Amino acid sequence: SPAEGNLNKFRKPLIPAYTDYTPWDELNDLQKDSLDLEMSVFAAMVDRMDQNIGRVLQKLEEEGKLENTLIMYLNDNGSCPFYSNKFADVQPGPAHSYWCLRASWANVGNTPYRQYKQCGHEGGSHTPFVAFWPGKIKPNTITDQVGHVVDIAPTFLDILQIPYPETISSYPTLPLDGSSLLPVLMG
């Protein structure tokens, strides 16, 4: 078929870049306050998460289990600009708010990559993966090796030296997706 037949007739051949990014200096005080509150709440959630991860690590250390524990921390996608608050008049912060970052902050959250979850750009898919395993993973190392969430099960099976079963309760299993990240973790 001709190329013009493959175009989305509603969006036209060339789609302008989506953006709601307005330079900070061009925002009015109310807009600045709203964006400031949004990022303050997000930062508070990150801080709360960090404190609680610290509590888990402290408990593992107190019980003498930290040295024998592999901890993986990752997320499945980059920041996401959802405008899906359940109540129009609720600002970010209360427990009944489902306020997410707007596109401008979501894009900043994925720096240095462009865009966010809904887009095909790296900001939506190129995310951090942090692994901590005392005595096994060399501290303060960084790799550019690509991995995916489907690599976690093969990694743990490899670490524990457990073969992936061919059957479960006499039913054949599907092939396991992913690859072990153990060689990457070990340097």
Go through the PLM ranges and name each one:
Residues 1-175:
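Active-site-proximal cap/lid insertion segments
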Residues 176-187:
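Short, intrinsically disordered, charge-balanced linker/junction segments flanking boundaries
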